[in-house]
Amino acid sequence: MGVVGVAHATSHFFHLLLPPLFPAFIEAFGLSYSQLGLLMSVFFVVSGVGQALAGFLVDRVGARPVLQGALACFVAAALVVASAQGYASLVVAAVLMGLGNAPFHPADFTILNQRVSSARLGHAFSAHGISGNLGWAAAPVFLIGLSSLAGSWRVAYVGAALLAGAVWLLVVLQREALDPPYEAARSSPPATEASAEQGAAMGRVAAKPLAAERLEALAFLKLPVLWLCFGFFFVVTAALSAIQTFSGPALQALYGLPLAASATVVTGFMLLGALGMVLGGFLSARIERLELTIGVAMSLSALLMLVVSSGAVSGPVAVALCILAGLGSGLAGPSRDMLIRRATPPGATGRVYGTVYSGLDAGFAVAAPLFGWLLDHGQPAGVFLGAAGAWLMGVAVAALIGRRLAHRRV
């Protein structure tokens, strides 16, 4: 769990490789917030498409080798940003970041489902979510802090490359902790092949046609609950996009706060989110109706965003409310992951998590340029209104998922 957590934190760190230093890119290359938001769309489109495909790759070759390749992409992305000469370089970096991010959820959840007992999975999912939030929390502090200390944003990205390289080395050194305990059995012929050999020896043809096997591998895509889970991730991560990427500029425009407040908001939001995930891990292990936990937690976060969007409070209070919204977001996390596990057919873990979590990438990809457009057109309150609306839609979708799963158990 520890190695998976560190790797997961790194992937979330690289979600925010670009946004904390958006002002530096505006100054260096003369870019707009819409253009910068489009960079995040490139990142998450590549990641979303790659994530769905990575689930099949993880099921076929194993999680750990895929994880190593992903971390290598992060190293390359940070080095490209460090040497960037314009917008095109940043687009290339966004593509590399997306390729690196794509395999993480199918790989991580495959490892956790293979290595952690069912009784401890709720806590494992909680720890996994916490590590992601810590990665998000660390990125603004690391990048803005190192940039300020060195007097150059390029040095900050060299530091990010070294960080990803260190985690890559950790994964290589700890490969035995990540490979499934039955790894040796994976190299033996699967049951269908063994049955075919036995049937051939008895004069029967028992092997499945290749086309039938492929259709069977895609059968999980017919499950309506799978696409509800995808939709849940889509709307919830649209809310996260507002906070992570544009809360700083929006607070500056709405309340006159300095742009440096963005680091405080994102870091505070993610740290309280991590605390929420600790508590949420216990809730997910004790409360059967997971959608109720999700509904209450995210409704509270949405309410706080509505207050911030009104402009009726002081700047420091607005910052505090944004940070406090992270607690509700975090509380919902472990219940969300357990809800998806209940919806996952046996033997399709990598494929399901890859498909469902690509909704995360799709949500970020669509939301980022929209929120950037709102800022460019003088509508900072729309950033917080959009976050509130997205969380409330997530509450509704979670209720639908819970209802479908309850009917399936009857």
Residue map of PLM features:
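Conserved MFS/SLC helix-loop-helix module at the cytosolic interface between two early adjacent transmembrane helices
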Residues: 49-85
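Cytoplasmic helix-loop-helix junction between adjacent transmembrane helices
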Residues: 93-132
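Extracytoplasmic gate region of multi-pass secondary transporters
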Residues: 18-19, 225-267
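Juxtamembrane intracellular "pre-TM" segments in multi-pass secondary transporters
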Residues: 181-228
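Residue-level signature of mid-helix packing/kink "hotspots" within the transmembrane helices
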Residues: 16, 44-52, 137, 270-274, ...
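Helix-loop-helix hairpin linking two adjacent transmembrane segments in secondary transporters
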Residues: 128-179
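Helix-to-loop junctions at the C-terminal end of transmembrane segments
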Residues: 50-62, 277-289, 375-376
